[in-house]
């Protein structure tokens, strides 16, 4: 089997390429810049909307995993964020899908986002695949539009489409907010998060690529949407404590009423960030379990341990070399 992976040099892409190679798959990697990759072949495509860029990379491919995207940012400085997200996440995705269908690709696996469902849930009322979508920012809107257009292409061309909506992904090499959290824990910064009673679904990158691999080949995955997580939800407090344990340090957490945290965040212009940190977001992965027979192969504890150990090791190396 020959699989094309866009975003092959990214955080998830590197893990996926490694897994597929272990499974004996021929992997064609694609990225916007030419880099060294574990893929059997790697192509640089600076503009994914270029209709002439895909003939060679798609040649002979049985399936395609589309990871590349314009990712969500907390404070987008562009004049028209939705237009920029649509350019990459909708228009370029559809160009790729049409080229893939013309090239004879049988299945297109699209990595979307749980943000298509919405930003928060009530405890014990997780998101499901058949819930009404509720995208609330430009990134989520663009992902939802891409999903709908891909399903239309599937009907028109016969190319199968699989959509996966992950929540926050962590793992070795993770950056952004998760890395900031690990940094705060490692260096013993006091955090007012000692009694946050929320529940959130997270996703270890190893579990995500496991589901992607399953969706590439399972007959029942065709033209389906799947939500995915580690299968065990934790509070923000529990997450920080687990990271501290894996780092070999004690979490310096103290309790502050959530209302006070929210009021302070509003004054500092951090309301949205705190809502995401302290709010609930749970997903139900029953469909992937029941339809595909898939189970997350890696526990939350083991996933966090691998993530933190890599983070601590990288920081130690930086300190040695500085």
Predicted ranges, named:
Residues 95, 145, 174-180, 194-217, ...:
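Substrate-positioning beta->alpha
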Residues 171, 193-198, 226-233, 244-248, ...:
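Glycine-rich Rossmann NAD(P)(H)-binding loop
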Residues 134-162:
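Active-site Tyr-X1-5-Lys
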Residues 45-91, 95, 99-102, 119:
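NAD(P)H-binding glycine-rich loop region in Rossmannoid oxidoreductase-like domains
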Residues 3-23:
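N-terminal Rossmann NAD(P)H-binding glycine-rich loop of SDR-like oxidoreductase domains
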Residues 94-138:
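Conserved Rossmann-fold NAD(P)-dependent oxidoreductase catalytic core, especially the SDR/UDP-sugar
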Residues 205, 238, 264-295, 306:
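Conserved C-terminal active-site "lid" loop/helix of NAD(P)H-dependent oxidoreductases
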Residues 214, 218-272, 305-308, 318-322:
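Mid/C-terminal beta-alpha module of Rossmann-like enzyme folds, strongest
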């Amino acid at each position: 089997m020959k699989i094309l992976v866009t975003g092959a040099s990214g955080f998830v892409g590197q893990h996926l390429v490694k897994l597929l190679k272990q499974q004996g798959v021929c992997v064609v990697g694609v990225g916007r810049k030419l880099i060294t990759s574990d893929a059997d072949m790697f192509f640089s495509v600076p503009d994914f909307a270029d209709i002439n860029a895909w003939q060679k990379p798609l040649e002979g491919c049985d399936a395609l995993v589309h990871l590349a995207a314009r990712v969500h940012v907390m404070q987008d400085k562009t004049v028209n964020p939705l237009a920029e997200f649509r350019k990459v996440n909708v228009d370029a995705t559809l160009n790729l899908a049409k080229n893939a269908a013309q090239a004879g690709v049988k299945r297109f696996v699209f990595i979307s986002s749980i943000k298509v469902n919405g930003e928060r849930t009530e405890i014990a009322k997780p998101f499901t695949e058949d819930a009404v979508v509720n995208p609330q920012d430009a990134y989520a809107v663009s992902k939802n539009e891409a999903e709908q257009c891909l399903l239309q292409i599937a009907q028109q061309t016969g190319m199968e489409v699989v959509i996966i909506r992950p929540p926050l992904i962590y793992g070795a090499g993770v950056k952004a907010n998760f890395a900031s959290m690990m940094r705060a824990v490692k260096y013993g910064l006091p955090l007012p998060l000692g009694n946050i009673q929320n529940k959130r679904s997270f996703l270890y990158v190893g579990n995500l690529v496991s589901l992607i691999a399953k969706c590439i080949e399972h007959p029942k995955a065709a033209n389906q949407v799947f939500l995915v997580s580690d299968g065990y939800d934790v509070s923000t407090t529990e997450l920080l404590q687990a990271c501290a344990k894996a780092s070999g340090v004690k979490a310096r957490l103290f309790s502050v009423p959530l209302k006070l945290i929210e009021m302070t965040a509003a004054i500092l212009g951090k309301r949205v960030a705190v809502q995401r940190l302290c709010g609930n977001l749970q997903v139900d992965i029953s469909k992937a379990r029941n339809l595909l027979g898939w189970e997350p192969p890696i526990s939350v504890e083991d996933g966090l341990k691998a993530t933190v150990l890599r983070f601590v090791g990288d920081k130690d190396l930086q300190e040695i070399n500085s």
